[in-house]
Amino acid sequence: MLKALVAKGPGGRVIVMDSISQATPKDAGAIVVSGSHGGTSSGEIALGVPFKVVVFNDAGVGKDDAGVAALEMLQARGVAAGTVAHTSARIGDARDAWENGILSRCNAAARNLGLETGAILREALSALIDP
């Protein structure tokens, strides 16, 4: 599984990881693009590392918004989070999300940083690290 630093600037660093389960304490403060779905199990893992921003795949959203449930969990802790549309990036493929992802959902903390639904993920995150 891929885990790589793909961008770095005065505002931080962007790490892509195919699974959020690859996160470690060394990733604290990073902007993380994960290939994982944005469900509650992914949210629980993401809460264990203090990310600046974390992005998941919306996995088609699913019943009762299960594919994006992590966004509310993370918002409750003040963590900026979003999802890319499953139609824009393959689930489980963080590099594809970084290169082709379109934001489908953003929590309030992410919107406060300037992330918006419909934005090209790479451009939006690049603006955060190199304002």
Language-model segment annotations:
Residues M1-P131:
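Residues that scaffold, gate, or flank divalent-cation-dependent active/transport sites
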